[in-house]
Amino acid sequence: GVAFDDGSYTGIREINFEYNRETAIGGXQV
């Protein structure tokens, strides 16, 4: 199961999304 409560899990998801998006832009990938 998920080891985080909804708040922490959502926060981590948001951080990962931002990181992946910035990485994609930095790598010139759309």
Swiss-Prot record:
Query: What superkingdom does the record give?
Result: Eukaryota
Question: Is Membrane there in the keyword field?
Answer: no
Please name the GO terms that the record assigns under molecular function.
carbohydrate binding; IgA binding
Record keywords, A-Z: IgA-binding protein, Lectin
What region holds the Jacalin-type lectin domain?
1-30
The record's section on PROSITE patterns has:
JACALIN_LECTIN
- What does the UniProt record say this protein does? N-acetyl-galactosamine and D-galactose specific lectin. Binds the Tn-antigen structure GalNAc-alpha-1-O-Ser, the T-antigen structure Gal-beta1-3-GalNAc and IgA.
Q: How does it assemble?
A: Tetramer of four alpha chains associated with two or four beta chains.
Family statement = Belongs to the jacalin lectin family.
Q: What's the protein here called?
A: Agglutinin alpha-1 chain
The organism is Morus nigra (Black mulberry)
